[in-house]
């Protein structure tokens, strides 16, 4: 995720005239955003059209799917790699590379694709919109992705609270079976592929890929130690790839339109279109598909109607779901919404769930509430997470009141650093990063609150 930037440079030989260089490459894009309607992949994001098979076919789903399957795994993987698609679940790992780990000679064990629809990150609801309004895109994506990695079946693990979404998805799967699009001889390609739905039971930790696999197998949803990785030993001990709903759902469109088309959006290494959730103190909260690398300010003002009270009323933004560090208004002015730009801004794209907070927000209380969430959802398997997040939760509760000393701010920072990177899964990191963002950008607010509490305490003592 924290990939280093590649600095690409070139120079002409001293004796060669520029006009004879023969350089016909197009100039790199410098502006991003304003995605055209014809370039949108998710055409029923707001549920204005029929989400069933008939409506999906009319919008281009399942078009030439048989041809895609017959071109074979290597061709599909090639298009996905050309597209530059990176995982849309948060980590941003190159999808083509990840899927290619499965495309190796079989050792006799079946291979499986597992789709992570256990969307429990606070502020995130992009996958829910796909499941609710465009389920056939996901079912078709399972088929294309499964073909790319030679999988026998797909398991879609859906969050337990998503009752209506699971119902719509099950209807879409049934329609696809009845139309011969999946199952035996899927789409008439000679390729057999099944799709199953597994309901979760409300545990946030099951969004972690190995905990999700454990849950599918009927065990407690606790993350596994890696290695072995799921590509070697996954669900039922078989090679498995776990992928995000959005990642899988865009793959058929990439294959139909071509990887170079998808790569034409966004910056280098941050290509494609992306679903963004915009919530909090905005005039029109929404989920929208936009070009990667769109400026954060443009995203909020164009699609969400701007910050309540105007842009100058903005305090901070959490750009990628609750587990990414917040950024203040000064950073929000110019930052681009992609993996690399947000890493440089000391945060992350995460799930691209933009949580906007205006000046009326008690920023300390808001972050404390997130830490309480992570404390509640920790599985307790790793000591740094089990003890450290609980400790952070108690310290943050005192910070909300101001009942602490300024030196404790550095202690809290140190606690977060001892949790980060020292756990089996990333839940510990997700709890540590919001605290780090708060301290990095709002230390004066913490110190002022502590000073105010101390003065009030002294006044009460003097009065008594």
Swiss-Prot record:
Entry cofactors: FMN; [4Fe-4S] cluster
Residues annotated to bind [4Fe-4S] cluster: 379, 382, 385, 425
Family to which this protein belongs: Belongs to the complex I 51 kDa subunit family.
Residue numbers binding FMN: 199-247
PTM annotation (N6-succinyllysine): residues: 81
Cysteine disulfide links: none
Protein name in the entry: NADH dehydrogenase [ubiquinone] flavoprotein 1, mitochondrial
Membrane topology value: Peripheral membrane protein
Keywords of the record: 4Fe-4S, Acetylation, Electron transport, Flavoprotein, FMN, Iron, Iron-sulfur, Membrane, Metal-binding, Methylation, Mitochondrion, Mitochondrion inner membrane, NAD, Oxidoreductase, Respiratory chain, Transit peptide, Translocase, Transport, Ubiquinone
Swiss-Prot/TrEMBL GO biological process terms: mitochondrial electron transport, NADH to ubiquinone
MF terms (GO), sorted A to Z: 4 iron, 4 sulfur cluster binding; FMN binding; metal ion binding; NAD binding; NADH dehydrogenase (ubiquinone) activity
Assembly description: Core subunit of respiratory chain NADH dehydrogenase (Complex I) which is composed of 45 different subunits. This is a component of the flavoprotein-sulfur (FP) fragment of the enzyme. Interacts with RAB5IF.
Binding site for NADH: 87-96
Organism encoding this protein: Pan troglodytes
Catalytic activity: a ubiquinone + NADH + 5 H(+)(in) = a ubiquinol + NAD(+) + 4 H(+)(out)
Omega-N-methylarginine: residues carrying this PTM: 257
First and last residues of the transit peptide: 1-20
Cell compartment(s), UniProt: Mitochondrion inner membrane
Described purpose of this protein according to its UniProt entry: Core subunit of the mitochondrial membrane respiratory chain NADH dehydrogenase (Complex I) which catalyzes electron transfer from NADH through the respiratory chain, using ubiquinone as an electron acceptor. Part of the peripheral arm of the enzyme, where the electrons from NADH are accepted by flavin mononucleotide (FMN) and then passed along a chain of iron-sulfur clusters by electron tunnelling to the final acceptor ubiquinone. Contains FMN, which is the initial electron acceptor as well as one iron-sulfur cluster.
EC identifiers of the protein: 7.1.1.2
Superkingdom of the organism of origin: Eukaryota
């Amino acid at each position: 995720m924290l990939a280093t930037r590649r600095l690409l440079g070139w120079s002409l030989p001293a004796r060669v005239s520029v006009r004879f260089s023969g350089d016909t490459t197009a100039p790199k894009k410098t502006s991003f955003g304003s995605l055209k309607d014809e370039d949108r992949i998710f055409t029923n994001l707001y549920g204005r059209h029929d989400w069933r098979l008939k409506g999906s076919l009319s919008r281009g789903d399942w078009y030439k799917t048989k041809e895609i399957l017959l071109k074979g795994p290597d061709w599909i993987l090639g298009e996905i790699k050309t597209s530059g698609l990176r995982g849309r679940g948060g980590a941003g790992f190159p999808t083509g590379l990840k899927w290619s780990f499965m495309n190796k000679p079989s050792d006799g064990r079946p291979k499986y694709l597992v789709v992570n629809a256990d969307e429990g990150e606070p502020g995130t609801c992009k996958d829910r919109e796909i499941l609710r309004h465009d389920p056939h895109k996901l079912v078709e994506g399972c088929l294309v992705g499964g073909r790319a990695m030679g999988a026998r079946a797909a398991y879609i693990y859906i969050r337990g609270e998503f009752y209506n979404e699971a119902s719509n998805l099950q209807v879409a799967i049934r329609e696809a079976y009845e139309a011969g699009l999946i199952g035996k001889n899927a789409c008439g390609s000679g390729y057999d592929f099944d799709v199953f739905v597994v309901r979760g039971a409300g545990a946030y930790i099951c969004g972690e890929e190995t905990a999700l696999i454990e849950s599918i197998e009927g065990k407690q949803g606790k993350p596994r130690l890696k290695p072995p990785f799921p590509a070697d030993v996954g669900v039922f001990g078989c090679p498995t790839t776990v992928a995000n709903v959005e990642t899988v759902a865009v793959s058929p469109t990439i294959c139909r339109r071509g990887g170079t088309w998808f790569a034409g959006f966004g910056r280098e290494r941050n290509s494609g279109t992306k679903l963004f959730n915009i919530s909090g103190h905005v005039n029109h909260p929404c989920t929208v598909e936009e070009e990667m690398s769109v400026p954060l300010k443009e995203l909020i003002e164009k699609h969400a109607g701007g910050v309540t009270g105007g842009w100058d009323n903005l305090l901070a933004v959490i750009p990628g779901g609750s587990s990414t560090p917040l950024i203040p208004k000064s950073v929000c002015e110019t930052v681009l919404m992609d993996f690399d730009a947000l890493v440089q801004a000391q945060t992350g794209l995460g799930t691209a769930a933009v949580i906007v907070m205006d000046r009326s927000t008690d920023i300390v209380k808001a972050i404390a509430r997130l830490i309480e969430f992570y404390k509640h959802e920790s599985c307790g398997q790793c000591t740094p997470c089990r003890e450290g997040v609980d400790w952070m939760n108690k310290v943050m509760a005192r910070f909300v009141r101001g009942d602490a000393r300024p030196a404790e701010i550095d202690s809290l920072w140190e606690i977060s650093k001892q949790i980060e990177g020292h756990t089996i899964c990333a839940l510990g990191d997700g709890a540590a990063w919001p605290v780090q963002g708060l301290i990095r950008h709002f230390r004066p607010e913490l110190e002022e609150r502590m000073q105010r509490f101390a003065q009030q305490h002294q006044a009460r003592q003097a009065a008594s």
